Amino acid sequence: GHAKKDKKIQKK
């Protein structure tokens, strides 16, 4: 999982 990247993109 990529929490850091997930927070930056957050496009789900």
From Swiss-Prot:
* Keywords, in A-Z order: Ribonucleoprotein, Ribosomal protein, RNA-binding, rRNA-binding
- What sections of the sequence does the record tag as coiled-coil? none
Please provide, alphabetically and separated by semicolons, the GO molecular function terms listed in this UniProt record. rRNA binding
Top-rank taxon of the source lineage equals Bacteria
- State the similarity comment: Belongs to the universal ribosomal protein uS19 family.
Q: Which organism is it from?
A: Clover yellow edge phytoplasma
**One Gene Ontology term, aspect cellular component:** ribonucleoprotein complex
State what this protein does: Protein S19 forms a complex with S13 that binds strongly to the 16S ribosomal RNA.
Q: Please identify the protein, giving its name as recorded.
A: Small ribosomal subunit protein uS19
